């Protein structure tokens, strides 16, 4: 609870958690926010992730393998129960464990599903299942341009929305994790070839239905050191520094955010 106080003292109002933690975390989160609200103060909000373990991503499995997809679907439902204080989780599953009896759902803004996807997993899945490029669920559907991996994500999103809507009569914001390795942006042929930029995930190919009322947003990991495409792209040598600043902006963060916004993603985390 002391850490939660330090976080708010820094000026932050929202905490992101990547995976299911021990029950101590949620108990402390409940006690901290309950005390804050009783004192008439702003609580700390939570965005929760659903993790995919590294072994599954770096193994021979594709995204439709049971150890990948079914585990992701099950963990999503487990997380919903945990946040509503309706779950007991045993040791040995690669996640936190304990008796989750405190309902912290009212402070949960939404979910970020998945991790920094490995480009080889995405490419392998898309190559192996060309016939699975469509998913038409009750709460999320894919467009005609979707890939098999994006269709898998739509299924995962539809699953967590359907479960929470049906069991708890609630909905929350949903996003899918993404990062530069699998971003949907266009790069020069030289960069694409020499830097092995061969996988892409475009969440614009996943759309909500009218039944998904809460809405969704884009989640994109940005780093000051990765990728180094611009620095290593030989095409950049043909431009003066001021030309590059005008074209890309002084800040790589600013440039990437502009590119994402131009795609139509108005809300970015």
Spans of model-derived segments:
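Active-site region of glycoside hydrolase catalytic domains
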Residues: 16, 35-269
């Amino acid at each position: 609870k002391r850490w939660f106080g330090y976080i708010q003292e820094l000026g932050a109002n929202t905490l992101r958690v990547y995976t299911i933690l021990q029950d101590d975390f949620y108990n402390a989160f409940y006690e901290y926010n309950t005390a804050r609200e009783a004192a008439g103060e702003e609580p700390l909000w939570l965005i929760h992730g659903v993790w995919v373990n590294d072994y599954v991503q770096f193994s021979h499995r594709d995204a439709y393998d049971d150890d990948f997809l079914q585990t992701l679907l099950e963990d999503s439902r487990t997380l919903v129960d945990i946040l509503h204080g309706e779950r007991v989780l045993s040791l040995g599953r690669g996640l936190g464990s304990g008796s989750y009896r405190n309902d912290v759902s009212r402070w949960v803004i939404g979910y970020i599903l998945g991790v920094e996807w490995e480009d080889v997993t995405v490419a392998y899945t898309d190559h192996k299942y060309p016939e699975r490029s469509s998913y038409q669920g009750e709460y999320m559907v894919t467009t005609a341009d979707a890939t098999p991996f994006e269709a898998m994500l739509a299924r995962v999103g539809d699953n967590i929305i359907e479960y929470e809507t049906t069991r708890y009569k609630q909905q929350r914001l949903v996003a899918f994790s993404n990062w530069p390795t699998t971003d949907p942006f266009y790069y020069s042929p030289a960069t694409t070839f020499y830097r092995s930029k061969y996988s892409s995930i475009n969440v614009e190919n996943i759309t909500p239905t009218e039944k998904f009322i809460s809405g969704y947003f884009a989640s994109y990991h940005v780093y000051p050191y990765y990728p180094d495409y611009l620095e290593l792209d030989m095409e950049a040598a043909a431009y003066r520094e001021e030309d590059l600043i005008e074209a890309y902006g002084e800040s790589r963060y600013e440039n990437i955010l502009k590119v994402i916004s131009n795609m139509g993603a108005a809300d970015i985390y």
